[in-house]
């Protein structure tokens, strides 16, 4: 039942004082002024509290259980991060600069830490999410080539067929032509394929390393050399940075632009649309094009530098999602250098433990040592049982587990992409393995049981097609 359906005429939670001020003409055009009162629910405070408490109890989150969503890094978010963020909630970005020096210092220290982790020279913290960071990075690349007088010819962005869908979308939004690179049989970039497409018309090569198959791009130094020899830039999608912290750095691999997901790698909560944070780091030759303001060290303090004539301009109001930065800063300070390295080591160990165990039951697309995630290929399983990857995912819900990412990456048919993260214990991983084995046996012995799952969730299977074609965004009587 929606909150609107619980509405009772005349019921109130609070009564506001009489409005005694004179009416003011706000200059709103007459045709835009509401003619009728908004349709708002009339409910008491206890109705509201019970309604949303009930909804919360039906929700699933990493605080409730295992969340192996591939390429999403759904790690546990320490609650100390929230405590620290609360300390800054009384600040306002329009305060005089001298009164927010603590916040500016925090952003400055965070920027330096992230530059050190990624091997970049400068950074903006403004972008609000990963895809926003991608677009910002590509706009920086565009400004760079425009400044060099090469934008007219450099119109192409090369993107592997295993890439996140946001990569080609961001490139197109930035005004580039997207060229797809077919992966090699080993799941990595095919150097011959790259060589065939790489010329002086290429502006950027976008890569994720490890890639979305959970495999490290072993030829990354060669790829970087090939890109730079023709004057192209190498862009790093930071979605999978959780696998390599303290072991290697994108900047050392030859990447010119690096975007991060603070809401993934650095344990700030994400999902359901936000809040996120997608900073981008760059090498020195791209620093003049970063969004303003850039945080600079000024003596013993940090300051905001707006004096960048070649900047692409602001990409986000004020300074970005600041409290998300506070949480990431807290996480980095808590973990330290050794802790972050251990995070990546455990993420890789957990993924390989699951891969080794599940490969005895399911077919792993690339069954060799992986990084932080791996992909199951269920194509033969579907032919054998009639049970699809989606059915397995739905059945997992009955076992109290969140499903992995399904049907991505697109180059693996009936894909199931599993990323356990570093925060899960062996006991939890074994529970997941046990559930996956039971579902496998159910699919063979009683496929209809799996096809009709889930059975224990508040809502069973949604009509995805109609929900996509005819979405309902607001309540109507």
From Swiss-Prot:
Gene Ontology biological process terms from the UniProt entry: glycine decarboxylation via glycine cleavage system
GO MF term set: glycine binding; glycine dehydrogenase (decarboxylating) activity; pyridoxal phosphate binding
Described purpose of this protein according to its UniProt entry: The glycine cleavage system catalyzes the degradation of glycine. The P protein binds the alpha-amino group of glycine through its pyridoxal phosphate cofactor; CO(2) is released and the remaining methylamine moiety is then transferred to the lipoamide cofactor of the H protein.
Enzyme Commission number(s) of this protein: 1.4.4.2
Organism, as annotated: Fervidobacterium nodosum (strain ATCC 35602 / DSM 5306 / Rt17-B1)
Keyword Oxidoreductase annotated: yes
Name by which UniProt lists this protein: Probable glycine dehydrogenase (decarboxylating) subunit 2
Protein keywords: Oxidoreductase, Pyridoxal phosphate
GO cellular component: cytosol; glycine cleavage complex
Cofactor (UniProt): pyridoxal 5'-phosphate
InterPro entries: GcvPB (IPR023012), GDC-P_C (IPR049316), GDC-P_N (IPR049315), GDC_P (IPR020581), PyrdxlP-dep_Trfase (IPR015424), PyrdxlP-dep_Trfase_major (IPR015421), PyrdxlP-dep_Trfase_small (IPR015422)
Superkingdom of origin organism: Bacteria
Top enzyme category: oxidoreductase
NCBIfam families xrefs: PRK04366.1
Summary of subunit composition and partner proteins: The glycine cleavage system is composed of four proteins: P, T, L and H. In this organism, the P 'protein' is a heterodimer of two subunits.
Substrates-to-products reaction catalysed: N(6)-[(R)-lipoyl]-L-lysyl-[glycine-cleavage complex H protein] + glycine + H(+) = N(6)-[(R)-S(8)-aminomethyldihydrolipoyl]-L-lysyl-[glycine-cleavage complex H protein] + CO2
Protein family membership: Belongs to the GcvP family. C-terminal subunit subfamily.
List of residues that carry N6-(pyridoxal phosphate)lysine: 264
Encoding gene (name): gcvPB
């Amino acid at each position: 039942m929606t909150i609107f359906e619980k509405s009772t005429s005349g019921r109130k939670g609070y009564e506001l004082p009489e409005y005694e001020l004179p009416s003011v003409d706000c200059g709103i055009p007459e045709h835009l002024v509401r003619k009728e009162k908004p349709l708002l629910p009339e409910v008491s405070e206890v109705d509201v509290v019970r309604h949303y408490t009930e909804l919360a109890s039906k929700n699933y989150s990493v605080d409730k259980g295992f969340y192996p969503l591939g390429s999403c890094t759904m790690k546990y978010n320490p609650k100390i991060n929230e405590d620290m963020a609360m300390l800054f909630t009384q600040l306002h970005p329009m305060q005089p600069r001298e009164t927010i020096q603590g916040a500016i210092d925090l952003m400055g220290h965070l920027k330096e830490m992230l530059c050190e982790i990624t091997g970049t020279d400068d950074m903006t913290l403004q972008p609000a999410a990963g895809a926003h960071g991608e677009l910002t990075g590509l706009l920086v690349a565009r400004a760079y080539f425009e400044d060099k007088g090469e934008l007219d010819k450099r119109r192409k962005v090369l993107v592997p067929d295993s890439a996140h869908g946001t990569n080609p979308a961001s490139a197109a939004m930035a005004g580039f032509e997207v060229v797809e690179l077919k992966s090699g049989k080993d799941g990595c970039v095919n150097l011959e394929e790259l060589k065939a497409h790489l010329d002086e018309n290429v502006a950027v090569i976008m890569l994720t390393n490890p890639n979305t198959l959970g495999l490290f791009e072993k030829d990354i130094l060669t790829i970087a050399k090939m890109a730079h020899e023709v004057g192209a830039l190498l862009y790093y999608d930071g979605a999978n940075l959780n696998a390599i912290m303290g072991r290697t750095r994108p900047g050392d691999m030859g990447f010119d632009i690096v975007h991060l997901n603070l809401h993934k790698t650095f344990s700030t909560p994400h999902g359901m649309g936000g809040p996120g944070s997608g900073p981008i780091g760059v090498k020195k030759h791209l620093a003049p094009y970063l969004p303003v303001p850039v945080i600079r060290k000024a003596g013993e303090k940090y300051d905001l530098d707006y004096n960048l004539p070649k900047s692409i301009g602001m990409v986000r109001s004020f300074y970005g999602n600041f409290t998300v930065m506070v949480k990431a800063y807290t996480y980095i300070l808590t973990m330290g250098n050794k802790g972050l390295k251990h995070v990546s080591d455990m993420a890789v160990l957990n993924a390989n433990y699951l891969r080794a165990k599940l490969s005895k039951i399911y077919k792993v697309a690339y069954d060799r040592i992986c990084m932080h995630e791996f992909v199951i290929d269920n194509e033969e399983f579907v032919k054998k049982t009639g049970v699809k990857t989606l059915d397995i995912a739905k059945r997992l819900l009955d076992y109290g587990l969140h499903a992995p990412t399904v049907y991505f990456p697109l180059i693996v048919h009936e894909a199931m992409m599993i990323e356990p993260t570093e925060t899960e214990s062996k006991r939890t991983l074994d529970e997941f393995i046990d559930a996956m084995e039971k579902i496998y046996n159910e699919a063979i012995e009683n496929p209809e049981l799996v096809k009709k799952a889930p059975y224990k969730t508040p809502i069973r299977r949604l009509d995805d097609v109609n929900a996509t074609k005819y979405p309902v965004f607001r309540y109507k009587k």
